[in-house]
Amino acid sequence: MLELIKAIFLGIVEGITEWLPISSTGHMILVEEFINMNLSDEFMEMFRVVIQLGAIMAVVVLYWNKLFPFSFEDRIQIKKDTFSLWIKVLAATLPAALIGVPFDDKIDELFYNYITVAITLIVYGVLFIIMENRNKSKIPAISTFEELGYKAVLLIGAFQVLALIPGTSRSGATILGAIMIGCSREIAAEFSFYLAIPVMFGASLLKLVKFGFAFSQTELIILLTGMIVAFAVSIFAIKFLMGYIKRNDFKAFGYYRIILGLIVVLYFLAVR
């Protein structure tokens, strides 16, 4: 029962931090210091990634009308726009797939530690503040997906590669990259959500294959619980973020990242 409660809490953390540009990994590292689940290291490594499937389903549910191209009710142009969007999403996914698949274990081995997480939290926090100050009086050059060209898409994909380093935040890196090349905040955030679908499905499948699908009944219940909670919380987190950025910029998230990065450093220096 206690492990189930811990899984629920981790699902809440995942559902919030996966979509806000504040690094789910950074929060997981901190949370796991206080919530130590009585399960194997191999299962927990897989759990951290596969729990994201629940979060991803929230995007699919919320944006189904934009993502599903086979509705009989949609006009031809709408279907063409949907196919075009998917081609752009897949193109932006290529850089992360080419680097992430062969080097996944090596990246975790080298960078999954509190020092890396703290540095990336702070650095990207500063970059968000600088970017928003720079763009304060600028009108976005890209405010629709039709205006989002393939060069811009590949550049956003290159930023997503940076998110392979723990603490960066996948949504943070892609949103930052998209805004830097001229996207509006809404387009940047929404495209970041769509990019997560192939990337996180792929990462989850990779971890499941490595784990071997060999779950005990307890492990399966814990994994499904975490995924369901992550799905429910993600619905609210995504709606919150899209509503928030219509009226505000990303600077608050930048300051939050800096504060969290300092907390990570101070905490681990104190206990290690």
From Swiss-Prot:
Keywords: Antibiotic resistance, Cell membrane, Cell shape, Cell wall biogenesis/degradation, Hydrolase, Membrane, Peptidoglycan synthesis, Transmembrane, Transmembrane helix. The chain crosses the membrane at residues 2-22, 50-70, 83-103, 110-130, 148-168, 195-215, 220-240, 250-270. It catalyses: di-trans,octa-cis-undecaprenyl diphosphate + H2O = di-trans,octa-cis-undecaprenyl phosphate + phosphate + H(+). InterPro entries: UppP. One of its GO terms (biological process) is cell wall organization. It comes from the Bacteria. Signal peptide: none annotated. GO terms for cellular component: plasma membrane. It is a multi-pass membrane protein. GO terms for molecular function: undecaprenyl-diphosphatase activity. Pfam families: BacA (PF02673). It is found in: Cell membrane. Its EC number is 3.6.1.27. The keyword DNA damage does not apply. The keyword Cell membrane applies. Catalyzes the dephosphorylation of undecaprenyl diphosphate (UPP). Confers resistance to bacitracin. Bacitracin is thought to be involved in the inhibition of peptidoglycan synthesis by sequestering undecaprenyl diphosphate, thereby reducing the pool of lipid carrier available. Belongs to the UppP family. This is Undecaprenyl-diphosphatase. The gene is uppP.
